[in-house]
């Protein structure tokens, strides 16, 4: 068994994630894709851990298995296909539904089944299943960043596994008897304080490692369905299946009020002709409230920090409930902290200024796949336009154009 990772008192979920990711990378345990940070980490003995699934009675007796698409679960998907079980995988980002069913071609041999179990096979050999499909899943296999012997689980922070399970409850695909299994390296089994768990967090019944099968005997209740008071309008827009499930539960007389139920539905469709609301000044200084700087002056300040054209990264589709401090924390965790951050929360976007184009492109790579509360963020280089002879300047992006390029409003950011 791998030496344990120490979890300090008062640590957060993100602290635990970072410790696990760092440990796997620093101890040469990681396998492709790398780095493992901000992923369900793949590890070198993942297939050995996955083979333990065939020793579980629930695997032998079930015919429908739902397995997440994470790389370290590839061996479980292969085992399910080889056992001729119905293999369900989540629809990518839940954009078009909940499940895809893997359908190997007739007469598929072991090599073809192996391909079907990979991420490419999920794309090439799966068909979507509608909400009305009669599905009864007795076994759910999820990836984890960390898990405790008590069954407490921590994912990569996007909430998809929790959301998928809650959706399955709502559509009647799982019951209280459904067994949840996770596959991890031994080092990922850590002490997780129960106070970090929330009502929507999914727990596990079995932990499979390369050396052990751990039965958790977890008594904590699994999610009983979608907690609508935690769902935002942005999430409803990004995950269309939620609207269908909301309509179903509304007709059944359930309270389906959203977290931001009084918020305007036009938030994500607001005109792009808007000026910044909150902005950190060059080199991290805070600009005074409602102070207007001429663009030539702003250009001079940027030059003082040696910022260059093309060194600005645009982040869009930011949920309206996100605070600037949350975004800054995520940027630091991914090693993508900018010299200057322009926050436009009402328009669901932000601009990150880096010292040069190389740093901006490195930030793009670090921010790949970033999401908040299950909502994928749009991250791309912002197209910039330097001042011309008349001093006019503005940022150009497919979602931003300044209405009056002669001034930029830069309110103070509360600390």
UniProtKB/Swiss-Prot annotation:
Residue ranges constituting the RRM domain according to the UniProt record: 311-384
Gene expressing this chain: mthfsd
Protein name: Methenyltetrahydrofolate synthase domain-containing protein
Listed InterPro entries: FTHF_cligase, FTHF_cligase-like_sf, MTHFSD_RRM, NagB/RpiA_transferase-like, Nucleotide-bd_a/b_plait_sf, RBD_domain_sf, RRM_dom
PANTHER family: 5-FORMYLTETRAHYDROFOLATE CYCLO-LIGASE-RELATED, METHENYLTETRAHYDROFOLATE SYNTHASE DOMAIN-CONTAINING PROTEIN
SMART domains named among the record's database cross-references: RRM (SM00360)
KW RNA-binding (keyword) present: yes
PROSITE patterns attached to this UniProt entry: RRM
Lineage: Eukaryota, Metazoa, Chordata, Craniata, Vertebrata
Keywords recorded for this protein, A-Z: RNA-binding
Region annotation (Disordered) ranges: 252-272, 388-415
Organism: Xenopus laevis (African clawed frog)
Biased composition (Polar residues): 390-415
GO cellular component terms given for this protein: cytoplasm
MF terms (GO), sorted A to Z: RNA binding
UniProt keyword annotation of RNA-binding present: yes
Top-rank lineage group of the source organism: Eukaryota
């Amino acid at each position: 068994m791998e030496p344990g990772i120490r979890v300090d008192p008062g640590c957060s979920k993100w602290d635990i994630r970072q410790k696990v990711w760092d440990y796997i990378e620093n101890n040469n345990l990681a396998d492709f894709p790398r780095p493992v940070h901000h992923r369900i980490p793949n590890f070198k003995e993942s297939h050995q851990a996955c083979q333990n699934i065939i020793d579980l009675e629930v695997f032998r007796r079930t015919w429908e298995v739902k397995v997440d698409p994470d790389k370290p679960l590839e061996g479980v998907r292969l085992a399910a296909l080889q056992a001729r079980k119905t293999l369900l995988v989540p629809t990518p980002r839940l954009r078009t539904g909940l499940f895809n069913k893997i359908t190997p071609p007739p007469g598929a041999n072991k090599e073809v089944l192996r391909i079907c179990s990979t991420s490419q096979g999920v794309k090439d050999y799966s068909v979507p299943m509608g909400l009305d499909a009669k599905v009864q899943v007795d076994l759910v296999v999820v990836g984890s960043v960390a898990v405790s012997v008590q069954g407490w689980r921590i994912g990569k922070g996007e909430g998809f596994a929790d959301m998928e399970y809650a959706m399955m409850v709502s559509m009647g695909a799982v019951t209280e008897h459904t067994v949840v299994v996770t596959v991890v390296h031994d080092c990922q089994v850590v002490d997780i304080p129960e106070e970090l768990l929330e009502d929507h967090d999914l727990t596990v019944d079995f932990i499979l490692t390369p050396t052990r099968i751990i039965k958790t005997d977890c008594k904590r209740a699994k999610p009983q369905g979608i907690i609508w008071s935690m769902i935002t309008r942005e999430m409803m827009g990004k995950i269309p299946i939620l609207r269908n499930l909301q309509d179903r539960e509304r007709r059944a007389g359930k309270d389906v009020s959203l977290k931001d139920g009084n918020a305007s539905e036009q938030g994500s469709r607001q005109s792009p002709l808007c000026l910044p609301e909150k902005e950190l000044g060059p080199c991290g200084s805070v600009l005074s409230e409602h102070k207007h700087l001429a663009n030539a002056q702003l250009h001079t300040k940027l030059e003082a920090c040696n910022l260059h054209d093309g060194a600005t990264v645009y982040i869009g589709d930011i949920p309206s409930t996100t605070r600037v401090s949350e975004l800054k924390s995520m940027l630091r965790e991914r090693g993508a902290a900018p010299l200057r951050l322009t926050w436009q929360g009402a328009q669901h976007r932000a601009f990150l200024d880096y010292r040069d184009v190389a740093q901006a492109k490195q930030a793009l790579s670090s921010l790949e796949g970033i999401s908040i509360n299950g909502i994928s963020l749009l991250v791309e280089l912002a197209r910039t336009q330097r001042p011309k002879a008349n001093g006019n300047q503005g940022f150009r992006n497919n979602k931003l154009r300044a209405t009056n390029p002669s001034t930029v409003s830069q309110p103070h950011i509360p600390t």
